[in-house]
Amino acid sequence: MFPRETKWNISFAGCGFLGVYHIGVASCLREHAPFLVANATHIYGASAGALTATALVTGACLGEAGANIIEVSKEARKRFLGPLHPSFNLVKTIRGCLLKTLPADCHTRASGRLGISLTRVSDGENVIISHFSSKDELIQANVCSTFIPVYCGLIPPTLQGVRYVDGGISDNLPLYELKNTITVSPFSGESDICPQDSSTNIHELRITNTSIQFNLRNLYRLSKALFPPEPMVLREMCKQGYRDGLRFLRRNGLLNQPNPLLALPPVVPQEEDAEEAAVTEERTGGEDRILEHLPARLNEALLEACVEPKDLMTTLSNMLPVRLATAMMVPYTLPLESAVSFTIRLLEWLPDVPEDIRWMKEQTGSICQYLVMRAKRKLGDHLPSRLSEQVELRRAQSLPSVPLSCATYSEALPNWVRNNLSLGDALAKWEECQRQLLLGLFCTNVAFPPDALRMRAPASPTATDPATPQDPSGLPPC
């Protein structure tokens, strides 16, 4: 129940091809609680949820939207690699379906109420776009929100000059944390409208704000989000969404209320039992009645999806020999189909080539600059320490060995070595002192007296000393 002063939002989670579940929920809300959609402050969506939110806000035919999802899934299943086949262009298909389904004034209806979750490529931050200037801009916002990198292509699309990718990467369920937000998700968990699995596992997996209970059914749903299941499975998911929407409305007292802004009176126990019985009847034998309440276009699409065409070509293609021959010819037909689809995409890409090439050059330069800066940072952290260790080790090995047992150890080093605080200066002065000591060892100072080199005259024979012995020959000394 919603009082007069209460405001509420509706948020649809991204889920790939399981978006047909959102179509069932939206059909239930539009049929049984139109006030809930009309009076909602904002209706948010991410990825496939953005497509349903756009259809719900702009008043587009939900039956046609559901039929488009089923047709796209059938086209993807026809190919050998499914959505990954080169000839399957999901972005082009989504754009064509939106152009055909949305009304001409869709951007006027959506501005201010619709919120599309996007992921900005430059920094990975989440952005919610709520204002649109034209129908093409609204369609481009949906294309950006559903663009899964590598799965849909390598070059992300542009909106208002900025590159965006799938909004589910950064925020798959916008504004889920607000208590007044009605959250819708095809995965069983803690969302307001979601499947109620009977698993007793209490563990949950939270992926970008989306609560997913850890059980086998959710694992199966996750596996079919990007690779579409059979049309019968999609039909059951749409019915499941319709049932879960009815359960939410009944549990909150919003089913078929003429004035929901007024508080509802308390419900007596007998009425609660009657409501529980109605829920049980709805679950057991009400599937046919549910199909009657679905939009006519969606009901027709669901019925057609369960019936195989009976023409001759379909019958021949389903025969076992033809299927075996087709599988054996895949190595030859796949390169040819890839070449044709590549040529077509290249021709369609020509108008955007200059802008995309410029963007790729900028991204390549940014990546290279980031790698260079990171390498410089790592080298700057390791090289100085390694070099200083090697220099200190080399200088330490060149020092003279001084025995530690020397009693006069303090006298072995000069005062400038003991008092210096810098090891490098001490080593430099020690080497200088060592060179001076070596020069002192190999240099000898010879001192001559002043008269050492003076010539002396010989002594006369008459002035001989009597104590000096005379030569017996009587000859004078030489």
UniProtKB/Swiss-Prot annotation:
The modification Phosphoserine is found at residues 366, 388, 398, 422, 460. Keywords: Cell membrane, Cytoplasm, Glycoprotein, Hydrolase, Isopeptide bond, Lipid degradation, Lipid droplet, Lipid metabolism, Membrane, Phosphoprotein, Signal-anchor, Transmembrane, Transmembrane helix, Ubl conjugation. The chain crosses the membrane at residues 9-29, 43-63, 138-158, 324-344. Residues 457-478 have a biased composition (Low complexity). Pathway: Glycerolipid metabolism; triacylglycerol degradation. GO terms for biological process: diacylglycerol biosynthetic process; intracellular triglyceride homeostasis; lipid catabolic process; lipid droplet disassembly; lipid droplet fusion; lipid droplet organization; lipid homeostasis; lipid storage. The active site is at 47 (nucleophile), 166 (proton acceptor). A motif (GXSXG) lies at residues 45-49. Residues 10-179 form the PNPLA domain. A motif (GXGXXG) lies at residues 14-19. It is found in: Lipid droplet; Cell membrane; Cytoplasm. It comes from the Eukaryota. Induction: Increased by rosiglitazone in subcutaneous and visceral white adipose tissue. It is a multi-pass membrane protein. Residues 456-478 are annotated as: Disordered. It catalyses: a triacylglycerol + H2O = a diacylglycerol + a fatty acid + H(+); a triacylglycerol + H2O = a 1,2-diacylglycerol + a fatty acid + H(+); a triacylglycerol + H2O = a 1,3-diacylglycerol + a fatty acid + H(+); a triacyl-sn-glycerol + H2O = a 1,3-diacyl-sn-glycerol + a fatty acid + H(+). It holds the Pfam family Patatin. One of its GO terms (molecular function) is diolein transacylation activity. Residues 30-42, 159-323 are extracellular. A motif (DGA/G) lies at residues 166-168. Catalyzes the initial step in triglyceride hydrolysis in adipocyte and non-adipocyte lipid droplets. Exhibits a strong preference for the hydrolysis of long-chain fatty acid esters at the sn-2 position of the glycerol backbone and acts coordinately with LIPE/HLS and DGAT2 within the lipolytic cascade. Also possesses acylglycerol transacylase and phospholipase A2 activities. Transfers fatty acid from triglyceride to retinol, hydrolyzes retinylesters, and generates 1,3-diacylglycerol from triglycerides. Regulates adiposome size and may be involved in the degradation of adiposomes. Interacts with ABHD5; this association stimulates PNPLA2 triglyceride hydrolase activity. Interacts with SERPINF1; this interaction stimulates the phospholipase A2 activity of PNPLA2. Despite a colocalization in lipid droplets, it probably does not interact with PLIN. Interacts with PLIN5; prevents interaction with ABHD5. Interacts with FAF2. PANTHER family: CALCIUM-INDEPENDENT PHOSPHOLIPASE A2 IPLA2 -RELATED (PTHR12406), PATATIN-LIKE PHOSPHOLIPASE DOMAIN-CONTAINING PROTEIN 2 (PTHR12406:SF29). This is Patatin-like phospholipase domain-containing protein 2.
